[in-house]
């Protein structure tokens, strides 16, 4: 690892394997989290409207894996998204390409679309712009100094859980959720029927958070892989990669 990357994202120490880890996914009401205990088993689920509030509730977590782009480039497309798209092929629509930082600094969709075309030659979908608020929120947490945060993508994690094969069914379908839940259970992550308040969150978001937690556990064990390897870096040295 290069010195710039080490300065911001030193790999978890061996002792981190004895600490809980957390996976986080964005949902309609804010954020949902799944925590795994030291041995990688389900320890609890939580939800909050604001990510920083959720992070404050897990001070002992060694790693927090978030399903949200972390690390925005000054120009060009991120290698992480291109590689993740290839990994979940033929379901390429499950991954979106993240344009440069200036796009996300725009005041609204129309301005962001103009900036995106100027910088990349391509437009920005309204669906992608819909992530703007949460993307800014997550990056503010990491840029503000919480370097427990790592970017993950649940579909990449599920593909890894499936020995390189992406789940063929949509995460919102009965078949898709059954397969994803079984893949997690095969790793010892058994989600209970009663999740308390977090049980009000759509099941696909809970499953995504659990997959993120599986990746967080791998990061804590220093067994994770990154797309790309080694990660790209921002101009300030922050890593830009999807971990699984």
Describe the residue ranges of each PLM region.
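RNase H-like (RuvC/DEDD) metal-dependent nuclease/polynucleotide-processing core
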Residues: 2-8, 12-21, 26-244
């Amino acid at each position: 690892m290069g010195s710039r990357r080490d300065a911001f994202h030193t790999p978890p120490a061996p002792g981190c394997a004895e600490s809980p880890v957390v996976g986080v996914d964005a949902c309609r009401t804010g954020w949902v989290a799944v925590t795994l205990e030291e041995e990688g088993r389900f320890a609890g689920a939580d939800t909050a409207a604001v990510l920083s509030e959720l992070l404050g509730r897990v001070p002992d977590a060694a790693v927090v894996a978030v399903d949200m782009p972390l690390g925005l480039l000054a120009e060009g497309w991120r290698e992480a998204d291109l590689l993740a798209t290839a990994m979940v092929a033929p379901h390429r629509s499950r991954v979106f390409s993240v344009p440069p930082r200036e796009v996300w600094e725009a005041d609204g969709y129309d301005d962001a679309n103009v900036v995106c075309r100027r910088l990349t030659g391509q437009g920005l979908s309204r669906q992608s712009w819909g992530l703007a608020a949460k993307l800014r929120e997550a990056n503010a947490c990491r840029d503000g100094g919480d370097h427990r945060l790592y970017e993950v993508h649940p579909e990449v994690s599920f593909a890894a859980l499936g020995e390189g094969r992406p789940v063929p069914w949509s995460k919102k379908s009965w078949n898709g959720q059954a397969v994803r839940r079984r893949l997690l259970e095969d790793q010892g992550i058994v989600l209970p029927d009663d999740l308390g308040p977090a049980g009000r969150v759509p099941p696909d978001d809970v499953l995504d958070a659990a997959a993120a937690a599986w990746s967080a556990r791998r990061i804590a064990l220093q067994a994770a892989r990154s797309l790309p390897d080694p990660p790209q870096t921002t101009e300030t040295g922050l890593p830009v990669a999807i971990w699984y």
